[in-house]
């Protein structure tokens, strides 16, 4: 009696468990569907944007798309044509205005330049003064050349005495048939010439009196004994003659020892 009751109870328990599971499953599904139904998308979310684009792609037919593309191309063409016309018009107007402005500027520059050049001219450097040559006097007497006899007598008198007194000059000019001014000027020129000659002789003597050292070479290196290079060459010195050149020999105004 106990054996048949056991399996019957187990089967009833299994059925009750399966019913409870089935009853729970639809509740869960309904809960999920309700949650999904309650879920809303924002208008700017990625899902909403993707959903709109997909709907538009599905709704638009190829014929409508072709028409829209053609209409868009026509609009673009007309836009660019109008824009090109406007750009050409604006360029022409701009070029005209630039030409007018350039003409006005050139006129203004010319006027300002003329005004500035007329009123503010650059300072001119003073030209160098021309070299003024000494001109002879118009009333100057012609130069009278001296004769040879007059020149000889003048040279002889100058060697005797370089400066003449008034009486001597008057007497000497009468003897040569010359004026006192001619004799006076000749003596002045002759003294200047004698001074120039004396200075030139002094310069020549100074140049000649400078010692001229001839280059020489040492027979052996410095610091080395002379015995290595042989005995030095000895030359006999001349013996001075007694009685000769005891006193200084004078040549003019200088003495040689």
Curated annotation (Swiss-Prot):
Superkingdom of the source species: Eukaryota
Q: Listed GO molecular functions?
A: DNA-binding transcription factor activity, RNA polymerase II-specific; RNA polymerase II transcription regulatory region sequence-specific DNA binding
* Compositional bias (Basic residues): 133-143
* A Pfam family that the UniProt record links to this protein: Homeodomain
What are the GO BP annotations of this UniProt entry? dorsal/ventral pattern formation; embryonic morphogenesis; embryonic viscerocranium morphogenesis; fin regeneration; otic placode formation; regulation of neuron apoptotic process; regulation of transcription by RNA polymerase II
Q: Which GO terms describe its cellular component?
A: nucleus
Write out the biased-composition intervals (Low complexity): 111-121
Give each disulfide bond as a residue pair.
Answer: none
> Which residue intervals are the DNA-binding region?
139-198
Q: Which CDD domains match?
A: homeodomain
| Compartments reported by the entry | Nucleus
The UniProt keywords, alphabetically, are: Developmental protein, DNA-binding, Homeobox, Nucleus
Record field: compositional bias (Basic and acidic residues): 12-35
Q: What is its main location?
A: nucleus
* Region span, Disordered: 1-37, 91-146
Similarity section: Belongs to the Msh homeobox family.
Q: What does this protein do?
A: Probable morphogenetic role.
Specify the protein name: Homeobox protein MSH-B
Name the gene that codes for it. msxb
